[in-house]
């Protein structure tokens, strides 16, 4: 009888130790989720501040080129974000930004723009 209770206590203790070990283990999925949430919020803010091409004066080559380049870099950032965070709230706009980025890249080349923005390169 004592052996029987000893085995139960040992099994219970083992279960508790396993549960503690699992609770203390690092959780990369949660960390990744937090990074994705933070980046999604940052992207939302950045998107609201993007310069619009239709507002740029068409005759001002420098402003048009910088506007195009800014939006191209944003499209790359969005693409990189969606590659890391496919369940992002921005996923539904991913295809639109990919097309927009391609169109702006073509316009950037047609206008013979030169890259002027340093820093983020996606």
Language-model features: locations:
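Cleavable N-terminal signal peptides
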Residues: 18-19, 29
